């Protein structure tokens, strides 16, 4: 659990973050979203004390972050930034090994961790360990950057616009990979972005910031259906609210029991994708299949459309 309590940062007479208080559940992904200058990156950096707060405090698992030296705190909190931030003169393996070496891990443990992480990120250790950052694609660089942030097995991972420099296809894959890895390790992730679609795609909860304040901290569906401020309505958009809402639910979660004669859709597909399939095929319902090919249930067009409306 991360408790952010009345956290404030001022530079002279300018207040960048203004008495922010939020609680972040262990093992969840929280996304902080806002426009440029809203204070979101400053808030993130106060969690690991890259920026020292003017007032307020951060408590991680019951311990105030000021109770230990800042450099020791940062060694147990993963940190990934836009553009990967890899050391250009170090190999992939050396980059990933950075924090474990600072923590005094033995060579065998470090080597095993490097190999495990590269395999998890679908990078062959034999092929990629000795490569340097300039020899990697943008997507590969970003994966190595996240692998480095996870190398010392942190319970908390901070990410500042980690996918902002990637093209849309690679970015979507990187987002899916992050979700899969978070489920695997149970890491508590706090991620900053200016992209509301990315926030909804990744976040269990989303904090919307403007002028240094958190206007609303809630589940994505609540931000769409019950925005607490006109700024949130503008940020989330009104023209495609139904599509965004459908993107938040999977076919497996919405399926009902009963046979269906329509096109097959994966249980992991979003209702937005199911709607597209039904409109394209002209079918009134779809058959929902589990990953192993067994039938999960069915989804009618009416049931899908109902999920695109507020309660």
Model-derived features: positions:
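Helix-to-loop junction immediately C-terminal to a conserved catalytic motif
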Residues: 48
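ABC ATPase NBD coupling module
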Residues: 64-78, 102, 108, 226-227
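Conserved ABC ATPase "signature" region
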Residues: 108-127, 180
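Conserved catalytic motifs of ABC-family nucleotide-binding domains
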Residues: 153
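ABC ATPase "signature
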Residues: 217-218, 226, 298
């Amino acid at each position: 659990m991360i408790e952010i309590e009345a956290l404030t940062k001022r530079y002279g007479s300018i207040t960048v973050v203004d008495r922010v208080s939020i609680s972040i559940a262990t093992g969840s992904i929280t996304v902080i979203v806002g426009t440029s200058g809203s204070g979101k990156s400053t808030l993130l950096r106060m969690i690991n004390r890259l920026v020292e707060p003017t007032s307020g405090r951060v408590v991680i698992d019951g311990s105030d972050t000021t109770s230990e030296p800042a450099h020791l705190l940062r060694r147990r909190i993963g940190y990934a930034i836009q553009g990967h931030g890899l050391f250009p003169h170090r190999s992939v393996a050396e980059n990933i090994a950075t924090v474990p070496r600072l923590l005094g891990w033995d060579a065998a443990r470090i080597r095993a961790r490097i190999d495990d992480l590269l395999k998890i990120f679908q990078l062959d250790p034999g092929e990629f360990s000795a490569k340097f950052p300039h020899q990697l694609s943008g997507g590969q660089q970003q994966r190595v950057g996240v692998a480095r942030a996870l190398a010392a097995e942190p319970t908390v991972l901070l990410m500042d616009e980690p996918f902002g420099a990637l093209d849309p296809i690679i970015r979507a894959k990187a987002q899916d990979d992050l979700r899969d890895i978070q489920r695997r390790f149970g890491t508590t992730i706090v991620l900053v972005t200016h992209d509301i679609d990315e926030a909804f795609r990744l976040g269990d909860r989303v904090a919307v910031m403007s002028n240094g304040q958190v206007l609303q901290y809630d589940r994505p569906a609540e931000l769409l259906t019950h925005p607490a401020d006109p700024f949130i309505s503008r940020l989330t958009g009104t023209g495609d609210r139904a599509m965004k809402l459908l993107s938040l639910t999977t076919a497996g979660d919405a399926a009902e029991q009963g046979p269906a004669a329509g096109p097959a859709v994966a249980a992991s597909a979003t209702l937005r994708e199911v709607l597209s399939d039904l409109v394209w095929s002209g079918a009134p319902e779809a058959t929902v299949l589990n990953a192993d090919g067994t039938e999960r249930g069915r989804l009618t067009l009416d049931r899908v459309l109902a999920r695109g409306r507020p309660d």
